[in-house]
C-alpha cells in the first residue's frame, strides 16, 4: 500500500525499501490498492514535486484490462475527454493491444499526463466500462523492468536519475 501508515496493518511499500541515513523516501505518485506496477521513490523533494506536478505533463503509461462494450465512439470519448467527479480527463493516447473480439475483457495501453486519484477507473466508468486490471508500466522515461518481480525493487542508475531530472529541468538531483 502506498502510504506511510496503514490503520489496517497491511504491508506498506516503504517497509520494502532500504533505510536512509538522512532524509526519507518520498513516493513519486501513488498507486491505489487495486493497481500494480511501477513506483518511483526518491529522497529529493524538489524532484518528486516536479515529476508529479500536472503542469509538467509527465507521461504515465498503463496496461488496462477493461470489461464492457467498447467501440470507436468509446475510444474517441476517452481521447477527447470525459467528465469525471473532479473535472475532465482524457488519455493522451489509448490503443487496443488485445484484438480478440470474443473475450469479455480487453487489454489497452493508455497514456495520461497527470495522476489524479482513480482517474483511469473513473474515465472508464464514465463510458459504462469497468477496469478489471491496471498496471503502470512507465513513468516519464522510466519503464517497469520486465524481470522485476512483484514486491521487489531496483535502484535506478545515475544516468536514469539524470534523465528523469532533465524531464523537469532539475540539475544535480
Description of each model-found segment:
Residues 1-173:
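Basic, flexible Lys/Arg- and Gly-enriched helix-loop patches that mediate nucleic-acid binding at interfaces
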Amino acid at each position: 500500500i502506498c502510504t506511510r501508515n496503514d490503520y489496517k496493518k497491511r504491508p506498506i511499500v516503504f517497509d520494502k525499501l532500504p533505510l536512509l541515513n538522512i532524509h526519507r523516501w518520498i513516493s513519486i505518485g501513488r498507486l491505489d490498492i487495486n493497481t500494480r506496477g511501477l513506483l518511483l521513490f526518491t529522497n529529493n523533494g524538489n524532484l518528486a514535486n516536479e515529476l508529479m506536478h500536472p503542469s509538467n505533463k509527465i507521461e504515465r503509461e498503463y496496461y488496462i484490462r477493461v470489461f464492457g462494450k467498447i467501440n470507436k465512439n468509446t475510444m474517441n470519448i476517452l481521447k477527447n475527454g470525459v467528465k469525471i467527479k473532479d473535472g475532465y480527463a482524457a488519455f493522451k493516447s489509448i490503443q487496443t493491444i488485445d484484438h480478440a473480439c470474443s473475450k469479455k475483457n480487453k487489454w489497452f495501453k493508455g497514456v495520461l499526463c497527470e495522476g489524479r486519484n482513480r482517474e483511469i477507473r473513473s474515465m472508464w466508468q464514465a463510458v459504462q466500462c469497468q477496469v478489471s486490471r491496471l498496471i503502470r508500466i512507465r513513468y516519464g522515461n522510466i519503464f517497469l523492468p520486465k524481470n522485476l518481480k512483484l514486491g521487489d525493487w531496483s535502484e535506478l542508475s545515475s544516468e536514469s536519475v539524470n534523465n528523469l531530472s532533465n524531464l523537469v529541468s532539475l540539475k544535480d538531483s
